[in-house]
Amino acid sequence: YLSYAISISTVIVAILGPVLGAVADHKNRKKPLFTFFMMMGVLGCAGLALPSGIIAFLAVFVIAKVGFSGSLIFYDSMLVDVTTDERMDEVSSQGFAWGYIGSCVPFVISLGLILGADQIGLSGTAAMMIAFAINAAWWGLVTIPLLRNYKQNYYVESKGHITAKQSLSQLAEIFGEIRNDRKVLLFLLSFFFYIDGVYTIIEMATSYGKDVGISDTSLLLALLLTQIVAFPCAILFGKLTKQFETGSLIMVCIGAYFCVAVYALWLDAA
């Protein structure tokens, strides 16, 4: 059922994404749209802490996932507004690195609650519910500095209220330009298949791990270790962009990712 919920949320974002992106290109639109989807994700995450049946839980999960994925549409595009082309790789890698290590704070707290639930008089379900609430609160709090300081510097000038027709017209124009630019078209197609595979592995890794016999505790610790290892690696690759082409480094990472994924495919037991 989890895979169906993930697929539904992905389809929703895929449909909304191009239109939302076109709207966000206009002046002072990016931050409000980001805030809306971020709050949808935060409230959805908090909603997962409420007791409910499997269907209600999955419905709230879809809302949270759409909020999270939708917010990334605008969050990722903010990079051009906060740095220069020369520093883009470095700033991006620093953002990923500190995001990875920062996420360990609520993760460790939640992990302590879940693994030590019996010692502090909590049921496993109660500990999990509190963990969802903690992560929702953390998500909302760490977004405040961005909301206070971000300013959209690059935008499309528009006269008056932006209509859906204008956004669709702009979108059609963009698609026309993409169709006539072979490099951009190939890049977008490649990125679509690449990122779809990456996110599928990330989101289904724990389910796959359970199927091959890895315990819940081991899976949680593995996820935590992944975040910790990702911190120095992100910084390292940011520095390597000064010595090597970004495209070459990306190919190295994709190659390593592919090898690990193929190896995992043949696992039949932990």
Model-derived segments and spans:
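Juxtamembrane intracellular "pre-TM" segments in multi-pass secondary transporters
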Residues: 151-188
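Hydrophobic core of transmembrane alpha-helices in multi-pass small-molecule transporters
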Residues: 44, 54-71, 270
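Glycine-rich segments within core transmembrane alpha-helices of 12-TM secondary carriers
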Residues: 90-114
